């Protein structure tokens, strides 16, 4: 079974290379690298009004503080909709709100994992049954330090959304009979996969996508 699964990973990596181009997709031991560390090939700067400047330097994506939301989104939609993990590492340098919002597919819809929103401490999923991360049962509270790298991971299966901050599981949401959607507004531009910050100075690195066993 392990050999079959590894073969599926190789096929998946090859598929992404074929559709997105070798500039942004590099097979790696921890999944498929969506960011090549050199430029934003395969990505686009999301057209948020008043978004902060974005550049690549020293193998990281540097996002300056914007008026409100800033970020990037994958420039292609040929990605898995379920049975995958998405992960990224992020560091907040300044600001008091979320610094690595991850927008991702959930079947035929999308959701966002928000670490450190609503003043810097709320962690959760937006939106569930029309309620934001601060309002629904995924809401937890966590202090995020500046100048410290955090590892964020999202796992999507047909039955669940699970999220981790470093090694701590912070979301374990059953999807049956739940209405999953993006919060209405600018975040709807952050598809099919997006990374966003809200009035923060942010560094992003090691963006990976990996299929998992059904």
List the predicted regions and their residue ranges.
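Bacterial N-terminal signal peptides that target proteins for export
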Residues: 2-12
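Bacterial N-terminal signal peptides
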Residues: 12-23
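Carbohydrate-interacting regions of secretory-pathway proteins
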Residues: 24-214
